[in-house]
């Protein structure tokens, strides 16, 4: 008998928000039938959370706190990937989208507005 997994909990979460819920989360197995390789597996665990009216800075802080908690629970002092290392307990650098484009792609995003 065929078995099915969600591709994303986003639609169900947005329906709950539209129905008046203010704070929700979903943690569960999801499926994406796309690329497959050492960095991509079709089945994985996804966390999504929403808070109505919350500033994006608070959500960025949530992400930093979540990474620090995951590292602490795993007993890790740092995260390493492809020769790079990050301290999950340090205050993260915050960039605007325009700053990220300039730094990492050499594109002045603001200069393209109205061009």
Which residues fall in each region the model found?
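Class II aminoacyl-tRNA synthetase catalytic cores and aaRS-like
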Residues: 1-115
